[in-house]
Amino acid sequence: MVVGLFGGSFNPPHQGHALVAEIAIKRLGLDQLWWMVTPGNPLKSRNQLAPLAERIAESERVAADPRIKVTAFEQALGVSYTANTLARIKARNSHVHFIWIMGADSLQTFHKWQKWQEIARTFPIAVVDRPGATLSYLSSKMTRTFDFARVDEDDARILWRKSAPAWTFIHGPRSGLSSTAIRNGAVPGAVK
């Protein structure tokens, strides 16, 4: 089984997140995508962070595809930081092939994540295009550090077979929706 792991605060979740998930399912040939709602992000302010239960319920509403499973692994496992969460998930599911999925906008700060290189050396990574990040991803520390491990986008469907480090950049339809803009009221009438 091939499972994509798509984590974030999803504050709030919106159709742009669902689009990233759908692109990942299709282009990577995923059997499932685990939409991992985090209790919080140490790199972001918690001032406007909606309660976890609310973000989970909204994520379930937005993620209509039955292959998408909305989870709160970090809270359930009692861990924080993505690297720790992923290590626990992998240890409990040794029969599953995992791919870490992230939007290209998150790639610019990926090097600030705790144990980011460990994540890249443990899981193949699929970076999905986001507005404003199409070219900037090339200058990210992750892509420079692991340039040798890039998998051509045409081979994205076999990314799960690659030993980490391995990563690909996936182009596709993009949504201009942003959780920050929605929270700040900059997207009037936005469908979350």
Swiss-Prot record:
Answer yes or no on keyword Transcription: no
Identify the SUPFAM superfamilies for this entry: Nucleotidylyl transferase
Q: Name one GO biological process term.
A: NAD biosynthetic process
The biological pathway it contributes to is: Cofactor biosynthesis; NAD(+) biosynthesis; deamido-NAD(+) from nicotinate D-ribonucleotide: step 1/1
Record's catalysed reaction(s):
nicotinate beta-D-ribonucleotide + ATP + H(+) = deamido-NAD(+) + diphosphate
Q: Which InterPro entries match?
A: Cyt_trans-like, NadD/NMNAT, Rossmann-like_a/b/a_fold
Which keywords belong to this entry? ATP-binding, NAD, Nucleotide-binding, Nucleotidyltransferase, Pyridine nucleotide biosynthesis, Transferase
Q: Name one GO molecular function term.
A: nicotinate-nucleotide adenylyltransferase activity
Q: Which CDD domains match?
A: NMNAT
**Keyword match Nucleotide-binding:** yes
> Its Enzyme Commission number?
2.7.7.18
Q: Which Pfam families match?
A: CTP_transf_like
Enzyme class comes to transferase
Q: Which HAMAP family match?
A: NaMN_adenylyltr
Q: Report the sequence similarity comment from the record.
A: Belongs to the NadD family.
What does the function comment of this entry state?
A: Catalyzes the reversible adenylation of nicotinate mononucleotide (NaMN) to nicotinic acid adenine dinucleotide (NaAD).
Per its record, how is this protein called by name?
A: Probable nicotinate-nucleotide adenylyltransferase
